[in-house]
Design a protein with these regions (language model features):
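Glycan-recognition and catalytic cores of secretory/periplasmic carbohydrate-active enzymes
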Residues: 1-133
Length: 133
């Protein structure tokens, strides 16, 4: 996959490792930026943590897999998502781009990469809580 970006030339393991480290640093920067947003924006798929987390999970999975540390970070971000959902008062935007539906969909796709962690059950629980609002 990454070789296509470089004109069809395969990357060495060292080059992939360098890419992964740079990518992780960029993700951490983006997450710190998103931490300054209000909960609605912080948890939007298009500009917030769920979209960043989804890119993080799938790029790392495609370039060597998710380490235990990566998985722990994703779970931590999901727990923050749950906390932020509780902070959103009143009707919630449920659109796919910048609303809760897109965020839940992103977390569900991430959960597919982490089947042993059973995040799907938590996601369904959050969706049900929102439905009952």
């Amino acid at each position: 996959m990454l070789g296509l970006i470089h004109g069809g030339v395969s990357l060495s393991n060292d080059e992939i490792d360098v890419f992964r480290e740079k990518f992780k640093k960029r993700v951490m920067f983006e997450i710190k930026e998103a931490d300054n947003y209000p909960p609605e924006a912080r948890q939007a798929w298009c500009s917030g943590i769920p979209g960043i987390a989804e890119a993080f999970a799938y790029v790392l999975d495609a370039t060597g897999g998710l380490s235990d540390h990566d998985q722990e970070m994703l779970v931590k971000l999901f727990r923050e998502f749950q906390h932020d959902l509780d902070l959103i008062n009143g009707p919630a935007d449920v659109s796919l781009c910048h609303g809760i539906a897109g965020s839940l969909a992103a977390w569900y796709r991430i959960a597919c990469l982490l089947p042993d962690l059973h995040l799907s059950d938590d996601i369904r629980f959050e969706a049900e809580k929102l439905r009952q609002r």
